[in-house]
Amino acid sequence: MNKVYNTQNDFARGIQEFLKIAMPNIRKTQLNIIPFIMLGAILAESFVPLDIAKKLKGDFSLVQVDSVTKRIKRFFTNKLFDPYVFYDHIIRFVINTYKKKHPDKDVHIVFDHMFSHDHFTVFMITMRIGKQGIPLWFRCFKDNNDTEAFKLKLMQDGISYVSSLFDKDFNLIFLGDRWFNSTKLMEHIDSLGHTYNLRLKSNINVYHHDKKENHKIRKTVGQLPKKKYHSVYYKNIELTDSKYIVNIAIAPYGETSEPWIIATNGDPDKAIRDYNKRFGAVECVFKNQKSNGFYI
């Protein structure tokens, strides 16, 4: 009985054919090396050039490991290779073929910062698919103190990019934690025609109509009435001194002293359910990070 074995060259050819479709103008030198780097990285579960080189077979096994390692390093430091442009081609191809199986057309988009000790910071926007988080857009910064990683303009650029990936048939719902309390960020998402569900810090000021005093009073969002076992919803709340209008959902606080307080431009009744979906995507991405990107 004959048994067919796929070699590294077979896999590489398959990746090359995909890249030719997704990136018609890819350089030949990149087309020849990228598939093998991808295979080596997967096999080694590492992006360290030496680890990748040790896993490569076929023609690479005829070359000393040091030489293969140097070739991989040259690729990573080559100014003609832009990883952001490369990933842009890949993700646009993927999203163009993406179809939702359920009728509501909701797509949950999560943005967050990831840190690797003191080595680097990544601002990443991901799409939740099942129990996985698929990166759509990201920017990397050295160490964990680079202020560029936290600038509003960077976040707005990433959100605008993600918006451009999807046609109007999809309902994009952006989810963010307490790092992202900017009303300008909310306004930007709203201007693109999408929904935001952002968790608020409890010390943010709001202007709330007090029924007893029969006028608006200034208080922190954490001081808004809430219930232990039921969600509470507020519509048309003025947020911060800019008095930006949002809807607010406060989850049941149960045994915790800090319940979820979600600002949304959508239905507050749906906001908590949507925000809960942030965790499946984020946890997956964090596991990816802690396992060198190879958690599946």
Per-segment meaning from a language model:
Residues M1-S46, K55, V65, F86-D88, ...:
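Single, function-defining residue in the core of a domain
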Residues F36-G40, G58-D59, N96-T97, V110-H113:
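Short secondary-structure capping/turn segments at boundaries of alpha-helices and beta-strands
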Residues I52:
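Short alpha-helical "recognition helix" segments of helix-turn-helix
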Residues L56-R71:
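Short, basic interhelical loop/turn and adjoining N-cap
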Residues T69-W137:
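Active-site-proximal, Lys/Arg-enriched surface segment
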